């Protein structure tokens, strides 16, 4: 069994048309029955920001477990919708929330850290399904409460899952083709970087670049993803 982890951000799944395009990308990856896709999705673009804005109006403490429970719903919606589109295209697909695997985390709500992932559950499901769509950015604490990993946490979800199932490949898809010296949508003179080390991309991420979440880079460096 060859497992390809694929992570798609909010702009990639911003609407139904884009979700259909992503579904085609996933389908093209599965050229034989021995290949499986473990897809990690963010919420549709703008959804998480809208939820955060609502919370700010209510003046709710971000350390409240209910904050994480509601904030995680964006990924639940996009993952279920993607699974429906893939199933309609002829692939055997199902969506999974963090607690259904489970992705176990600490109880540091709104910025939890992953402790353990039940890879056995994922591998068992791949006996029945071609594609598993995992809601990124979330897990479950020891006291059975939904947790979130912090903004950009879906990158961390993808790398952690790739490590757990010993994936053959982990791909992070964005609306920018590659890594640039600065945001090419803002800086026209930005240059594409052909090769980059873990240390260099970690420095970029830690300095505010939105290329990858710093924790995902740390995990990738540690486990050679």
Ranges and model annotations:
Residues 1-218:
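Nucleotide/pyrophosphate-binding catalytic subdomain
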Residues 223-225:
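Short, intrinsically disordered, charge-balanced linker/junction segments flanking boundaries
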């Amino acid at each position: 069994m060859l497992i390809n982890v694929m992570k798609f951000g909010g702009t990639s799944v911003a609407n139904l048309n884009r979700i259909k395009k992503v579904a085609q990308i996933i389908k093209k990856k599965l050229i034989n029955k021995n290949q499986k896709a473990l897809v990690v999705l963010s919420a549709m673009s703008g959804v998480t920001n809208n939820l955060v804005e609502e919370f700010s109006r209510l003046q709710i403490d971000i350390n409240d477990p209910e904050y994480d429970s509601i904030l995680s719903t964006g990924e639940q919606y996009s993952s279920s919708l993607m699974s429906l589109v893939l199933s309609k295209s002829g692939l055997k697909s199902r969506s999974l929330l963090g607690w259904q695997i489970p992705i176990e985390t600490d109880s540091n709500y709104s910025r939890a850290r992953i402790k353990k992932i039940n890879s056995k559950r994922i591998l068992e499901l791949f006996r029945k399904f071609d594609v598993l769509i995992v809601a990124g950015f979330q897990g479950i604490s020891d006291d059975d409460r939904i947790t979130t990993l912090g903004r950009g946490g879906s990158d961390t979800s993808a790398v952690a899952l790739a490590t757990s199932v010993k994936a053959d490949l982990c791909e992070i898809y964005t609306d920018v083709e590659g890594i640039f010296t600065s945001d090419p949508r803002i800086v026209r003179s930005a240059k594409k970087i052909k090769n980059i080390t873990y240390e260099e991309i970690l420095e970029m991420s830690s300095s505010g670049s939105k290329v990858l979440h710093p924790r995902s880079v740390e995990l990738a460096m540690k486990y050679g993803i």
